[in-house]
UniProtKB/Swiss-Prot annotation:
The keyword DNA-binding is annotated on this UniProt entry: yes
Protein name, entry field: Pituitary homeobox 2
Placement of sequence motif OAR: 295-308
GO terms under biological process: anatomical structure morphogenesis; determination of left/right symmetry; embryonic limb morphogenesis; embryonic organ morphogenesis; heart looping; heart morphogenesis; positive regulation of dermatome development; positive regulation of myoblast differentiation
Protein function: May play a role in myoblast differentiation. May be involved in the establishment of left-right asymmetry in the developing embryo. May play a role in vasculogenesis during avian embryogenesis.
SMART domains the record matches: HOX
Upper lineage: Eukaryota, Metazoa, Chordata, Craniata, Vertebrata
Cellular compartment(s): Nucleus; Cytoplasm
Gene coding for it: PITX2
Locus of motif Nuclear localization signal: 301-305
């Protein structure tokens, strides 16, 4: 009984009870073992009420802690195992993640490259069947052939872009150099203060080349003569107006013959221009394209001959100037 009253023995008793309850495999066995120990605990509380209560509270607290740890131990164990497995898996995987998988480079032979280049020159976008045929010829896989054509097209596009950039830097290229003239040759420089003083002279205009006038073989300064009536017509009208004043002693028959000669010498003019009623005010004739130099010289020579012939006739026949009433009449006596 003395050992039961001793507090140390009571604590040992509670600890033993705790161990028994915690080590039980099932709830039924733990409840039965605790149930068997309850009379001893009741006796200990009856013998030493103050110390037994404190020891009982401590034992109950330990029992609760042990039961909670027992119930949560499988889940905690699983969590700990999963965390340990993750850490073990992450250990060897970290270096593999850091290191990228290296690509396998294909080393083509010269024969394979020749075959691929020849096919690329014919067709830059081969279809699946063509790629398979090339793969059979070159002893390569279809994927390798497809990748080679993709890289080759990218290189070709880059080269085309570089060539276009060089053409833009050098101007419009060699094919446009003959069409575009330098700026200085097209527009000679003038100072801003000398525009009014210099002006455009006939010499500067004659030095310039006009392709339109060159094709017509006409000087640009003489272009006015193209759109004005020929000098031969005006000279002929002037000469015809001067005929009565020059030949005053010629009778009416002589004037008629002169008009007839003019009509015979210029049939084209008579068909185009009607004979005027008054020779002093002839109407302006329509435009007729003629060679101005040749026609004017020929008409002047013809008229000079006509004037000379009529002048001699008037000198040789002075009696022709007399009228009918001026002749002497012999009256019979």
């Amino acid at each position: 009984m003395s050992c039961m009253k001793d507090p140390l023995s009571l604590e040992r008793l509670g600890a033993g009870n705790n161990k028994l309850c915690s080590s039980s495999p099932s709830s039924s066995s733990s409840s039965s073992s605790c149930h068997h120990q309850q009379p001893a605990l009741a006796m200990a509380t009856a013998l030493a009420p103050g110390q037994a209560r404190s020891s009982l509270e401590a034992a109950k607290h330990r029992l609760e802690v042990h039961t909670i740890s027992d119930t949560s131990s499988p889940e905690a164990a699983e969590k700990e195992k999963s965390q340990q497995g993750k850490s073990e898996d992450a250990g060897p995987e970290d270096p593999s993640k850091k290191k990228r998988q290296r690509r396998q480079r294909t080393h083509f032979t010269s024969q394979q490259l020749q075959e691929l280049e020849a096919t690329f020159q014919r067709n830059r976008y081969p279809d699946m069947s063509t790629r398979e045929e090339i793969a059979v010829w070159t002893n390569l896989t279809e994927a390798r052939v497809r990748v080679w054509f993709k890289n080759r097209r990218a290189k070709w596009r880059k080269r085309e872009r570089n060539q276009q950039a060089e053409l833009c830097k050098n101007g419009f290229g060699p094919q446009f150099n003959g069409l575009m003239q330098p700026y200085d040759d097209m527009y000679p420089g003038y100072s801003y203060n000398n525009w009014a003083a210099k002006g455009l002279t006939s010499a500067s205009l004659s030095t310039k080349s006009f392709p339109f006038f060159n094709s017509m073989n006409v000087n640009p300064l003489s272009s006015q003569s193209m759109f004005s009536p020929p000098n031969s017509i005006s000279s002929m009208s002037m000469s015809s107006s001067m005929v009565p004043s020059a030949v005053t002693g010629v009778p009416g028959s002589g004037l008629n013959s002169l008009n007839n000669l003019n009509n015979l010498s210029n049939p084209s003019l008579n068909s185009a221009v009607p004979t005027p009623a008054c020779p002093y005010a002839p109407p302006t004739p329509p435009y007729v394209y003629r060679d101005t130099c040749n026609s004017s010289l020929a008409s002047l020579r013809l008229k000079a001959k006509q004037h000379s012939s009529f002048g001699y006739a008037s000198v040789q026949n002075p009696a022709s100037n007399l009228s009918a009433c001026q002749y002497p009449v012999d009256r019979p006596v």
